[in-house]
Amino acid sequence: MANNNSSNNNELLVYGAEQAIDQMKYEIASEFGVNLGADTTARANGSVGGEITKRLVQLAEQQLGGGRF
C-alpha cells in the first residue's frame, strides 16, 4: 500500500472530480427521495454515501475489464 503522509485521506486526485461526485450525490439522493442536509438522518445520508461507493466501484470494475481482484 502507498505511504500517504497527507492528513486528509479524502483528497481528490483528479481535477474536476469533486463536481462529478457532487452531481452523483444529488442524483442518487433524488432517486432515493432523500433531502440532503443537516436535518436529514445519518441513516438517510449514509445510504446516499453507500450508493456512491457502490457505483464508483462498479465504474472502476468496468474500466478494468470487469475483473475481480
Swiss-Prot record:
GO MF annotation list: double-stranded DNA binding
UniProt site positions, description: Cleavage: 27-28
Domain of life of the native organism: Bacteria
GO BP terms, alphabetized: DNA topological change; sporulation resulting in formation of a cellular spore
InterPro entries for this protein: SASP_alpha/beta-type, SASP_alpha/beta-type_CS, SASP_DNA-binding, SASP_sf_alpha/beta
Keyword flag DNA-binding: yes
Keywords assigned: DNA-binding, Sporulation
Pfam name, any one: SASP
PANTHER family: SMALL, ACID-SOLUBLE SPORE PROTEIN A
More details: SASP are degraded in the first minutes of spore germination and provide amino acids for both new protein synthesis and metabolism.
Record-stated family: Belongs to the alpha/beta-type SASP family.
Function: SASP are bound to spore DNA. They are double-stranded DNA-binding proteins that cause DNA to change to an a-like conformation. They protect the DNA backbone from chemical and enzymatic cleavage and are thus involved in dormant spore's high resistance to UV light.
Record-given protein name: Small, acid-soluble spore protein C1
Organism of provenance: Priestia megaterium (Bacillus megaterium)
Lineage, opening ranks: Bacteria, Bacillati, Bacillota, Bacilli, Bacillales
Gene it is expressed from: SASP-C1
